[in-house]
């Protein structure tokens, strides 16, 4: 395995910074954005971290939040946002884009682009926007397997 690149080093630093803040007493408010301009505004407003919204990212590209964007498209957007700020970025990784193997790759792709943390949803694929009714979730065992893979 090769030495970490600059983005991976930033990711590790931002991940540790985020972890430290999450372990501190009190609540942490993390506003969401779907592009680099929004992320910069969040940083300039003094927030400790920014969040890349999957629904906003999809909407900005003219799609509903039904998992239509690929992992590559979401990672690319997160990378642009992360490069524009010095605070940690938490990114939406939808359902992890498949099974446990896909989740492992998803984590590596986001991490390689300097993303401090991701979240994955427990919905079946194709997913529905988390704000809408009618969602179906995977079994607990299936989701635990994805978490372990991450």
Task: Please state what every model-predicted region is.
Residues 2-32, 36-45, 149:
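N-terminal amphipathic alpha-helix/helix-capping segment at the start of soluble metabolic enzymes
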Residues 13-16, 63-91, 113, 131-150:
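Alpha-helix-loop-beta-strand connector modules within alpha/beta enzyme cores
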Residues 17, 37, 76-77, 105:
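Short Gly/charged-rich anion-binding patches and loops
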Residues 27, 39, 48, 80-83, ...:
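Short helix-loop boundary/capping segments at the starts of domains
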Residues 29-35, 50-52, 89-93, 118-120:
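Hydrophobic faces of well-ordered beta-strands that scaffold small-molecule active sites
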Residues 38-41, 97-109:
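Catalytic cores of alpha/beta
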Residues 46, 114:
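Conserved functional loop/turn residues at catalytic and ligand-binding sites
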Residues 49-75, 95-100, 119-141:
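Glycine-rich, proline-tolerant flexible connector loops at the mouths of alpha/beta enzymes
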């Amino acid at each position: 395995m090769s030495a970490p690149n600059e983005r991976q080093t930033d990711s590790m630093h931002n991940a540790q910074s985020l972890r430290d803040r999450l372990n501190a007493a009190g609540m942490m408010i993390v506003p969401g954005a779907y592009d680099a301009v929004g992320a910069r505004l969040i940083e300039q407003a003094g927030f400790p971290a920014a969040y890349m919204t999957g629904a906003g990212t999809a909407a900005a590209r003219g799609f509903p939040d039904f998992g239509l964007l690929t992992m590559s498209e979401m990672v690319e957007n997160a990378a642009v946002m992360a490069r524009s700020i010095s605070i940690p970025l938490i990114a939406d990784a939808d359902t992890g884009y498949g099974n446990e193997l896909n989740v492992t790759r998803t984590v590596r792709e986001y991490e390689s682009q300097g993303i401090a943390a991701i979240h994955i949803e427990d919905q079946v694929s194709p997913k529905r926007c988390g704000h809408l009714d009618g969602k179906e979730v995977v079994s607990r065992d299936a989701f635990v397997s994805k978490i372990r893979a991450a």
